[in-house]
Amino acid sequence: MNTLVPMVVEQTNRGERSYDIYSRLLKERIIFLTGQVYDEVASLICAQLLFLESENPSKDIAFYINSPGGVVTSGLAIYDTMQYIRPKVSTVCIGQAASMGSLLMTAGEKGKRFSLPNSRIMVHQPSGGAQGQATDIEIQAREILALRARLNNIYVEHTGQPLDVIEKVMERDKFMTADEAKEFGLIDEVVNKRPAVEDDSAS
């Protein structure tokens, strides 16, 4: 596995300064979620969100997602932080947004949730295993049912779909194209190219 992260060198009045590519993009208020969602990743993303809020609470944050999902509680930590901070968070799906990845994608600011055309989106109900005494298994079963209800309500809030539709779709793995995700309400737009930036000098 190649873990090499490219470096970017910039000229400053104090000489050259180098950044890894993700740190340089963070300066532009761009955050990446790539791979599994787990506690360490969630802590890093939450910290970046909070840092960017402290830098400028009124400027949007761009959150790029390419994730197969992961630990539900870790994903909910990111979700809650996205809702908590003052800047609007725009989400962009690149590659895939599955399971908790799809929940974080749809949790972006309404009207600012995007996907590239060949991305894959998947939603499903949470899964888990339990072992031990019968009472312990019963407790775990109640907890995962409560968690399923919580996640369903989050999807209802952000997609505008009624609860019975969400419950039916979430019953099994449901894969969608970017266009299908837009029709369902998970995203707002499928984008092929970044919009052209107006030339300030022309005004």
UniProtKB/Swiss-Prot annotation:
Single GO term (MF): serine-type endopeptidase activity
Cell compartment(s), UniProt: Cytoplasm
InterPro entries the record matches: ClpP, ClpP/crotonase-like_dom_sf, ClpP/TepA, ClpP_His_AS, ClpP_Ser_AS
Pfam families assigned to the protein according to its UniProt record, in alphabetical order: CLP_protease
Reactions mediated catalytically: Hydrolysis of proteins to small peptides in the presence of ATP and magnesium. alpha-casein is the usual test substrate. In the absence of ATP, only oligopeptides shorter than five residues are hydrolyzed (such as succinyl-Leu-Tyr-|-NHMec, and Leu-Tyr-Leu-|-Tyr-Trp, in which cleavage of the -Tyr-|-Leu- and -Tyr-|-Trp bonds also occurs)
Keywords: Cytoplasm, Hydrolase, Protease, Serine protease
Self-association state and partner proteins as the record states: Fourteen ClpP subunits assemble into 2 heptameric rings which stack back to back to give a disk-like structure with a central cavity, resembling the structure of eukaryotic proteasomes.
Function in brief: Cleaves peptides in various proteins in a process that requires ATP hydrolysis. Has a chymotrypsin-like activity. Plays a major role in the degradation of misfolded proteins.
Protein name: ATP-dependent Clp protease proteolytic subunit
Gene name of this polypeptide: clpP
